[in-house]
């Protein structure tokens, strides 16, 4: 894995999980 590429995406996805209660990818 490229830390620079995956690190930012994973952080964004984790942040979205807080809002994405339905798990459908939309807030």
Swiss-Prot record:
Keyword Metal-binding: yes
EF-hand domain segment(s): 7-27
Sorted UniProt keywords: Calcium, Metal-binding, Repeat
Superkingdom per UniProt: Eukaryota
A Pfam family: EF-hand_1
Example of a GO MF term: calcium ion binding
UniProt-listed Gene3D superfamilies: EF-hand
UniProt cross-references to InterPro entries, sorted A to Z: EF-hand-dom_pair, EF_hand_dom
Residues engaged in binding Ca(2+): 20, 22, 24
Family: Belongs to the calmodulin family.
Function statement: Calmodulin mediates the control of a large number of enzymes, ion channels and other proteins by Ca(2+). Among the enzymes to be stimulated by the calmodulin-Ca(2+) complex are a number of protein kinases and phosphatases.
Name of the protein described by the UniProt record: Calmodulin
């Amino acid at each position: 894995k490229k830390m620079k590429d995956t690190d930012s995406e994973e952080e964004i996805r984790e942040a979205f999980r807080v809002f994405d209660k339905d798990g459908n990818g939309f807030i």
